[in-house]
Amino acid sequence: MPTSIPEQELMEPGHTACQGCGATLAMRYVLKALGKKTVVSVPASCWAVIPGAMPNRTLDIPMVYTPFAATGASISGLREALDIRGDSDYNVVGFAGDGGTADIGLQSLSGAMERGHNVFYIMYDNEGYMNTGVQRSGSTPYGA
């Protein structure tokens, strides 16, 4: 079955991430796959600064910035609000690293999954808390 990557870019040049940052590539391809009708929620992380400041943001989609532990709760609320508004065709995405998912954010993600919300959750596992000095996370392999 032939597949293709859409040409539309929802992540423009000029972000502030470190060179070679895997999180930026992950976000770029997630947005290509999900399209313009996407709302992304990110916790306190590198993604709080990667898109840049308004009005020069590099992402062409709405983003919600949440406390570290609240990504799961925010995507639950976003999904419910969009459904109530009649915008059920929007994709709702939580996009967090391994620290914000496997450690600090696990309880709110668990709640969102248990309630069965129609959302996407992307954990980009870079095996540490990269924006605060590369401390290990709960998903960092033993001995790494």
What is each stretch, according to the model?
Residues 1-121, 128-130, 134-143:
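Cofactor-binding active-site loop characterized by glycine-rich and histidine/acidic residues
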